[in-house]
UniProtKB/Swiss-Prot annotation:
UniProt region (Interaction with UBQLN1), positions on chain: 1-200
Name of this protein: UBX domain-containing protein 4
First-listed, main subcellular location of the protein, grouped into a coarse class: endoplasmic reticulum
Organism listed in the record: Homo sapiens (Human)
Originating gene: UBXN4
UniProt free text on domains: The UBX domain is required for interaction with VCP. The intramembrane domain also contains the signal for ER targeting.
Lineage: Eukaryota, Metazoa, Chordata, Craniata, Vertebrata
Amino acid sequence: MLWFQGAIPAAIATAKRSGAVFVVFVAGDDEQSTQMAASWEDDKVTEASSNSFVAIKIDTKSEACLQFSQIYPVVCVPSSFFIGDSGIPLEVIAGSVSADELVTRIHKVRQMHLLKSETSVANGSQSESSVSTPSASFEPNNTCENSQSRNAELCEIPPTSDTKSDTATGGESAGHATSSQEPSGCSDQRPAEDLNIRVERLTKKLEERREEKRKEEEQREIKKEIERRKTGKEMLDYKRKQEEELTKRMLEERNREKAEDRAARERIKQQIALDRAERAARFAKTKEEVEAAKAAALLAKQAEMEVKRESYARERSTVARIQFRLPDGSSFTNQFPSDAPLEEARQFAAQTVGNTYGNFSLATMFPRREFTKEDYKKKLLDLELAPSASVVLLPAGRPTASIVHSSSGDIWTLLGTVLYPFLAIWRLISNFLFSNPPPTQTSVRVTSSEPPNPASSSKSEKREPVRKRVLEKRGDDFKKEGKIYRLRTQDDGEDENNTWNGNSTQQM
């Protein structure tokens, strides 16, 4: 269908100028509108409405549809209005119809339009005859004046048959007929009028031909666009079908490969089951022998492991590594046979420390246990001191027989014992008040854990030199670290060089 591309007023003017039927197709977005549009685009409908019809297509949501509905109410969508020259609808198609039905309606509308046009022409001719007859009857005697007035009218008004004729021959014959009836007074004006009429006729014909060519060109463009869209749609359908076929083939190939893999796995499983059955049948007779051999090998392996475990435990239990921790914080280590009595370890400790702590006893801290005289006769292995253990030396009071009385020694010892705390406090206060620079560290060990016992150190020749050095270097009892003073110990010099574990214990 060749739709008019302009606005509604332009389409109405074109229809009136060509004497055609004005067709308005109101379409929407529903399925019926799509079907009706397809019926309008049918070749039969296009051929039937090619002449005497000016069609325009408007959308229900457009402004043109709103203006059109104010004059012609749009009851339903889609709707097709066939409007004649007088503006009265000749036919209204509500809803969607088939292409054949639409062609029938178009023929019917064309017949109605032709009938109305013929009726209007007949009515116009009758009115003209009725007007001319009274004018002739009113003046029967003045024939000359009537003829002159008629000739003047013919000279002033060009014949209507010339302007409405479609062919040049018909116009020329009508012109010759009228010119033969003209009087001699109009003979000089007629050639100029005939030339103007011919120019107008030729101009109209050229315009009609241009319009026809333009319409033909538009129709060809529309057909080309339709063909292009049809070809594009066919290409898309072809590509879609090819993709679907390719996908289908790939899916079938994949399913076939899966089926083959599944069958191959089943065959392998069956073969494995057959092999297992054959092996079971082959080794059924020797199964008990194999199990007995395995049991014997397992027992031998367990016995070997037990022997290795015992030998390892025996090797570990043959040596006992004992760490002796002294009251001043120092320690020393020695190894003993695991079957040696605890008395041997005590004698080694006594030889090492000498008579520094007098009579002492041994004890363990974890678990806390102090060994008695009966324990000294037991083996280190029985006391759970093998393969390694840490033993603490606990000083005790010396026996009375080992004390040698000396009058001068006892007095000075008693005075030193009584005055020692006061001297220590006085030195601490003086150090704080006068803030003397700290002396250099010495490697001499000073026992600060317990005050000297006068009963145990009065006649000890080994401890007298130590006591004298302690009294001479009493100013070294305090160690300054920034603004903090602390008492010195005998291990201050060694603590910085010792190696400590992560749990604040010294490595052995």
